[in-house]
């Protein structure tokens, strides 16, 4: 792994090592661009990952927060503080947003209390990028990659779907290896995918993008490095960041470009905390919308008591899909 000087202002600093930051860092490093990735959390190895609830204490962002608004700043937010970010705890379900979902306002109209709007882009605009992402991540059911075999949850789902006359049901599109690929093993259906994946079959930047970037010699990962502030010069051009290391010591890393990829809470917090005389409302906030309009990802769940033993904890979190 490369090591860059704190005063090297030719590097690109990326804040965060998850789906956005980890992937960006690898793409830049592969093209010969020098990258310093600052990650607030620590780096885990496969030996640190266990199949159990205790993993959430290892990977979750548990730091207490202070806020000035009416809402509780410590509201439950399933984000991670670890190398790999939320690619460590996601279930691996890699589904495309469907064409009709890009036109929510057109399709559903104005709804009381809702702020529905149409996307400024369409499904066709993203199609080629979806294709590239699915290939990079090894998404099952795409690029000739076989789907995962059905676990017991899926067998129950499929039997019910068949009895009801459905024809289109399968184990979904998952960024979890159904066969050896990209130097990682096939899924063994051991469950607890959202605890990090103990064998590395699930796509996570911890297992994929970060080590590939390090292998180029153009990438330095600094875990347990909490960015406090983004600095800029008198013209307003970003010049670097100030961060605290694992011991609380403060450092300034110079940079030619800073990419902020610290999830939906930490990114706006950092931008707002980087306010200055030149940018009194925080960085990148000419709209006044940074830190506003927070939207959570909703998930519906259904549980049922079955006549036979199912062992729902085994296998992937998403049993399957019925269309």
Please tell me what each predicted stretch does.
Residues 27-30, 34-36, 41-51, 216, ...:
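Glycine-rich loop(s) and the adjacent beta-strand/alpha-helix scaffold that form part
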Residues 4-9, 45-56:
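Accessory recognition modules or surfaces
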Residues 56-146, 307, 311-314:
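Redox-cofactor-proximal catalytic regions of oxidoreductases
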Residues 182-184, 232-239:
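A short, glycine/Asx- and small/polar-enriched loop/turn
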Residues 4-20:
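Beta1/beta-strand and adjacent pyrophosphate-binding region of the FAD-binding site
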Residues 46-50, 91-93, 101-102, 180-182, ...:
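Short, solvent-exposed loop/turn and secondary-structure capping segments
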Residues 69-72, 107-227:
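Conserved redox-cofactor binding core of oxidoreductases
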Residues 18-19, 23, 265:
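Residue-level detector of alpha-helix initiation sites
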């Amino acid at each position: 792994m490369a090591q860059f000087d704190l005063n090297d202002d030719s590097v690109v600093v990326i804040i965060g090592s998850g789906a956005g930051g980890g992937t960006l860092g690898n793409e830049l490093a592969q093209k010969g661009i020098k990258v310093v990735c600052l990650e607030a959390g620590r780096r885990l190895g496969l030996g640190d990952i266990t199949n159990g609830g205790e993993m959430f204490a290892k990977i979750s962002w548990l730091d207490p927060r202070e806020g000035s608004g009416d809402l509780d700043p410590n509201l439950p937010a399933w984000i991670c503080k670890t190398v790999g970010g939320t690619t460590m705890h996601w279930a691996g379900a890699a589904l495309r947003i469907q064409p009709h979902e890009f036109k929510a306002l057109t399709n559903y109209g104005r709804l009381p209390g809702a702020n529905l709007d149409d996307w400024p882009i369409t499904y066709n605009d993203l199609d080629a990028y979806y294709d590239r992402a699915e290939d990079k991540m090894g998404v099952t059911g795409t690029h000739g990659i076989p789907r995962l075999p059905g676990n017991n949850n899926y067998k129950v789902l499929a039997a019910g779907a068949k009895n009801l006359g459905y024809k289109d049901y399968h184990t979904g599109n998952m960024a979890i290896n159904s066969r050896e690929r990209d130097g990682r093993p096939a899924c063994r259906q051991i469950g607890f995918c959202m605890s990090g994946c103990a064998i590395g079959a699930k796509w996570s930047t911890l297992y994929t993008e970060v080590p590939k970037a390090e292998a180029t010699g153009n990438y330095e990962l600094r875990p347990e490095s909490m960015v406090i502030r983004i600095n800029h010069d008198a013209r307003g051009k970003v010049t670097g960041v100030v961060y605290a290391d694992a011991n609380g010591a403060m450092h300034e890393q110079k940079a030619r470009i800073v990419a902020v990829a610290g999830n939906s809470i930490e990114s706006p917090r950092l931008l707002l905390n980087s306010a200055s005389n030149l940018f009194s409302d925080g960085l990148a906030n000419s709209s006044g919308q940074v830190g506003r309009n927070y939207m959570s990802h909703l998930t519906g769940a259904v549980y049922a008591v079955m006549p036979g033993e199912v062992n729902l904890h085994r296998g992937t979190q998403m049993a399957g899909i019925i269309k």
